[in-house]
């Protein structure tokens, strides 16, 4: 009965999907997603960027592009029958884009059926690397986009509010992960109460939740803990200015281990660069002002750390 109440499916992905998120807006997720995409494409890999910051998409601006005439909403509304039909060029060899800039009002609130169709089709895309740039917040849509990835990359800045929002994102992600993985109704109900923190049910750490689950289903808590260990989550600290800022990454990784019982690998930090904002205001392509900066070199180093062939044991499906 070691795996009672859990669903497990073998992964069949032939691509490597990376989701880039973090909970708070303004931390530089889009910049880092675009830059990693450029680095991977420069090494000869076929790369696709997906702007899933639904409702406030801006990834096209990092390539000096006007809002593309086709975008993700055309696939969502079935104006385009295939997701490949909304892919556009970025002007960089080997690097393509699915833009969200044309998205209609309400796109941020995808129905379950719409989300399932998008996620399942993303998994079938034949690119070596797929980078999904997520919007801020902890909605189910954002969490589910993060969970289909082989590797999730959290982007935060040294500010306390950004760090706090990252922890909140991780906690929400784990509860969502368990909610979608566990079939046992009583355990699902327990998780739901913990998320809402109703009826006096509050879990300060994932270990409190696992202990409560053990009371309902002996041994299931241990099994869930082993499944949590399969999550591949990374962390990048953006906009760093001091050595103290750079030290935050390792500290956050330790906190994640202590309170969430998961391993988060600190990939590195990215230096503050005032020229980035200047370039964006002038609608200049990222490559025109960024490739020789210290920040870009740091992102290039990060891109080299995430390129091994990741393969999840758990594969979420949205049928």
Q: Could you say what each language-model-derived stretch is?
A:
Residues 52-128, 197-204, 214-217, 226-229, ...:
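P-loop/Walker-type NTP enzyme "switch/lid" segment
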Residues 1-26, 35, 39-46, 81-85:
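Extreme N-terminal, non-catalytic leader segments
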Residues 281-295:
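C-terminal boundary of histidine-terminating zinc-finger modules
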Residues 135-265:
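Conserved catalytic-core segment of NTP-binding enzymes
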Residues 260, 271-282:
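Nucleotide-binding motor/catalytic cores of P-loop/tubulin-like NTPases across gene-expression machines
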Residues 54-56, 102-105, 137-138, 159-162, ...:
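Conserved nucleotide-binding/hydrolysis micro-motifs of P-loop NTPases
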Residues 29:
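Conserved lysine of the Walker
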Residues 32:
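Hydrophobic positions on the alpha1 helix immediately C-terminal to the Walker A/P-loop
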């Amino acid at each position: 009965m070691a795996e009672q109440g859990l669903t497990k499916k073998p992964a069949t992905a032939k691509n490597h999907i990376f989701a880039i998120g973090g909970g708070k807006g303004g931390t530089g997720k889009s910049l880092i997603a675009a830059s990693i995409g450029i680095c991977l494409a420069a090494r000869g890999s076929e790369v696709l960027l997906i702007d899933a910051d639904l409702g406030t998409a801006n990834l096209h601006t990092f390539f000096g592009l006007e809002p593309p005439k086709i975008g993700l909403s055309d696939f969502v509304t079935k104006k385009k029958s295939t997701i490949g039909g909304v892919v556009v060029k970025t002007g960089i060899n080997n690097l393509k884009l699915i833009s969200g800039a044309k998205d209609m009002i309400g796109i941020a609130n995808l129905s379950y059926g719409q989300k399932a169709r998008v996620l399942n089709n993303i998994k079938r895309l034949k690119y070596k690397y797929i980078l999904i740039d997520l919007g801020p917040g902890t909605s189910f849509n954002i969490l589910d986009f993060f969970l289909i990835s082989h590797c999730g990359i959290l982007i935060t800045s040294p500010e306390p509010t950004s760090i706090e929002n990252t922890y909140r994102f991780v906690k929400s992600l784990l509860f969502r992960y368990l909610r979608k993985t566990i079939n046992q109704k009583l355990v699902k109900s327990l998780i739901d109460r913990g998320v809402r923190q109703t009826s006096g049910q509050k879990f300060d750490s994932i270990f409190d939740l696992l202990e409560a689950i053990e009371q309902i289903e002996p041994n299931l808590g241990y099994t869930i803990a082993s499944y949590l260990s399969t999550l591949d989550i990374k962390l990048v600290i953006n906009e760093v200015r001091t050595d103290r800022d750079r030290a935050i990454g390792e500290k956050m990784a330790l906190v994640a281990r202590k309170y969430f019982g998961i391993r988060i690998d600190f990939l590195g930090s990215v230096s503050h660069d005032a020229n980035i904002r200047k370039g964006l205001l002038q609608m200049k392509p990222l490559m025109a002002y960024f490739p020789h900066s210290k920040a870009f070199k740091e992102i290039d180093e990060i891109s080299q750390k995430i390129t091994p062939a990741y393969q999840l044991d758990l594969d979420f499906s949205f049928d």
